[in-house]
Amino acid sequence: MLDAKYLRENLEEVEARLATRGSEVSLGRFRELDERRRALLTESESLKALKNSVSEAISKVKDKSQIQDKIAEMREVGVRIKGLDDELRGIEDELQMVLLTVPNVPHPTVPVGASEADNRQVRTWGEPPCFAFDPKPHWEIGEGLGILDFERGAKLTGARFTLYRGAGARLERALVNFMLDLHTERHNYLEMLPPFVVNRESMTGTGQLPKFEDDLFHLEGVDYFLIPTAEVPVTNIHRAEILKAADLPLSYTAYTPCFRKEAGSYGKDVRGLIRQHQFNKVELVKFVHPATSYDELEKLLSNAEEVLRQLGLAYRVVELCTGDMGFSAAKTYDIEVWLPGQETYREISSCSNFEDFQSRRASIRFREDEKSKPEFVHTLNGSGLAVGRTLVAILENYQQEDGSVVIPDVLRPYMGGLQKIG
């Protein structure tokens, strides 16, 4: 959520920067409500000052019969004050709802563009493998090895659900454990295991609500939601808290399943694991001092990249343009892994700096010292990594002509020493 004072003082600049996102964001309603709010506040405070002053004078008059008119007038003033305060509460509630639907302002360094075609490639790592045969897509490999069962997954639930079997299930579990070990032991993140169901306040705090409620799985009969990402519960761990500057940065990692309706994705990635309603992910979340948040973003990005480097998977890093960024982000990098079966790079992680956009919504603050005024922290997060897509990349990059798949060296201890599937 943007700061109302900053918005008021920089309205035209903010509108211009939000326009680069490609969404039609009009701040006219904010201006109307904000002006009405300030007018009501001024009138209410003026009447309260008058009422207090007159009431004090009345209290000093011994013969109240001489000032009955003034007493009656102050009763009317009290009624007027109540009416103003009631209207003010309604205006403030509506103003809050308007602010909750305004996206974050892109950082000045973010490239301006309309779509992913305008994203900027930052770097590449590794060389895509060369095969002496035509590489298969992961769904053919997985079905051929009997480790992915798309038909039974659909029977159990529906489209975009998959049953992992045998070595496929073990490989998924191995990836989760490998990622968590890497981030906790080498990168010094604290592991969390949060609830997979959260309340409305948590979804609002990270920016999923109120704007994207139709994209979420809502539980019937209770106002809870299945999480679309561990970002939601982990960021909200410190909702409505004041942290100590000396404790920053706080770095957390968590494995969770994620649940998404994937509204608007009809016809996209209809085969395989790329776009599922339920998938596993290891998330990285940071609470940082505003002065160091962009340095911390680069560190978080490097931590996510390290997973792919350890696995020997070629990838590239792209900086998202203004029109391709998520609602809450001020700056985002995507990591895209090479998939030979599709002959293209596909997103496997998004790493973002939200600045104080989420912390303002969730009231996550810090103090420099005991006497300092609380300030909003900056929040960052990124996938470290999407587990299913990492499994996809392993199947496609490590496939052999005979249909088998070689297990990357770093995963073999997690696979009981298994060197190859098939």
From Swiss-Prot:
Its main location: cytoplasm. Its EC number is 6.1.1.11. L-serine binds at residues 229-231, 283, 383. GO terms for biological process: selenocysteine biosynthetic process; seryl-tRNA aminoacylation. CDD domains: SerRS_core. Coiled coil: none annotated. ATP binds at residues 260-262, 347-350. Keywords: Aminoacyl-tRNA synthetase, ATP-binding, Cytoplasm, Ligase, Nucleotide-binding, Protein biosynthesis. It comes from the Bacteria. It catalyses: tRNA(Ser) + L-serine + ATP = L-seryl-tRNA(Ser) + AMP + diphosphate + H(+); tRNA(Sec) + L-serine + ATP = L-seryl-tRNA(Sec) + AMP + diphosphate + H(+). InterPro entries: aa-tRNA-synt_IIb (IPR002314), aa-tRNA-synth_II (IPR006195), aa-tRNA-synth_II/BPL/LPL (IPR045864), Ser-tRNA-ligase_type_1 (IPR002317), Ser-tRNA-synth_1_N (IPR015866), SerRS_1_N_sf (IPR042103), SerRS_core (IPR033729), tRNA-bd_arm (IPR010978). Pathway: Aminoacyl-tRNA biosynthesis; selenocysteinyl-tRNA(Sec) biosynthesis; L-seryl-tRNA(Sec) from L-serine and tRNA(Sec): step 1/1. GO terms for cellular component: cytoplasm. It is found in: Cytoplasm. One of its GO terms (molecular function) is serine-tRNA ligase activity. Belongs to the class-II aminoacyl-tRNA synthetase family. Type-1 seryl-tRNA synthetase subfamily. Catalyzes the attachment of serine to tRNA(Ser). Is also able to aminoacylate tRNA(Sec) with serine, to form the misacylated tRNA L-seryl-tRNA(Sec), which will be further converted into selenocysteinyl-tRNA(Sec). Consists of two distinct domains, a catalytic core and a N-terminal extension that is involved in tRNA binding. Homodimer. The tRNA molecule binds across the dimer. This is Serine--tRNA ligase. It comes from Geobacter sulfurreducens (strain ATCC 51573 / DSM 12127 / PCA).
